[in-house]
Amino acid sequence: ALLQIEENNHILNQEIAKVYTLYRANQIEPVLLKGQGVAQNYRNPLHRQCGDIDLYIGPKNYEKANKLLRTESTGEHEENHKHTCIHWHGVDIENHRVLSRLSSPSSDKSFQQEIARWHGTTACRNLEIEGYQVTLPPLSFDVAYVLTHSALHFLNEGIGLRQVCDWANILHTQKDNIDLKEIADLLQKWGLSKAAKIFGVVAVNYLGLPMEDLPIPYTQKDIETGEWLLNDIWQGGNFGQHNQNRKQRPKGYWSGKWYTFTRA
C-alpha cells in the first residue's frame, strides 16, 4: 500500500510539471493549491495520500486554461461557479476560477480581497517539487487557507485526520518562516478563529504539535469541542467520506454544528 502511495505521488508530481509547462507556454501562471504543495511539509512528502491537482487560475485565463486541457482530456466532471474538474493524462485537474467562497459576506469580501492582493504578483512563493518549480500562494495565506478549506470541507462532507495533519505539518515545518500574528489576523477576518482553536486541540493533544506553533492558542473551554471534532473524524472514516448517513443529515443539523464550530 505504501509503495502504491509513493507511486501515485510520483505520477501526480510528473503531471504537475506537464500541466505547468503547458500553461506557461500559453502565458498562464497557475497557483498550486493544497495537495502536493502542502505535502512538501511532511517528513516524507511521498507518504501523504494524494488526490487531484488543484490550480488557481483566476477569471481572466479560466476558459483558456480549460480549453488547453480539453484537447487531451478523457472526461470531465460537473462544472460549477468555482471550478471545472477535467480528467487529463489519467489524473483529475481542478482549474479554479474562484479559489473558494466563505458564507459570511464580510468574511468573503476580506478573503477575495486578500487573493486579489497577491495573485499574479511577486508575493507568491516558488517551490520545487521533484525538481520542477511551481508557484504557491504567500505563506501566511496558505496556512490560513489550509485551515479554511478543511473547515468548509467539514461542513459539507466531513473531514479525515489528514486535513488536520496537513495544517499541523505546515505550521510546524514552516515555524521559522511564518508570521503567526498575520495568520491569526486573516483567520479572524474570515470568521475562523474558533475553528483554529478547535483544530488546535486535535493537533496539539493528538498529533503532538507544540502549542507555541498555533496562530490562535485554544483555551480550556475549547477542549470539549475539539474532542467532538475528533469523534466526528473517527465516525466519518479515513477521509470523512465513508459515512453514508452524513449525506442524509438535514441542513439544519449541519448549520447547528457549524455554529458550534465557528462561534467565538
Please give the residue ranges for each predicted region.
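Conserved NTP-donor binding/palm subdomain of two-metal-ion nucleotidyltransferases/polymerases, i.e.
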Residues: 1-51, 57-264
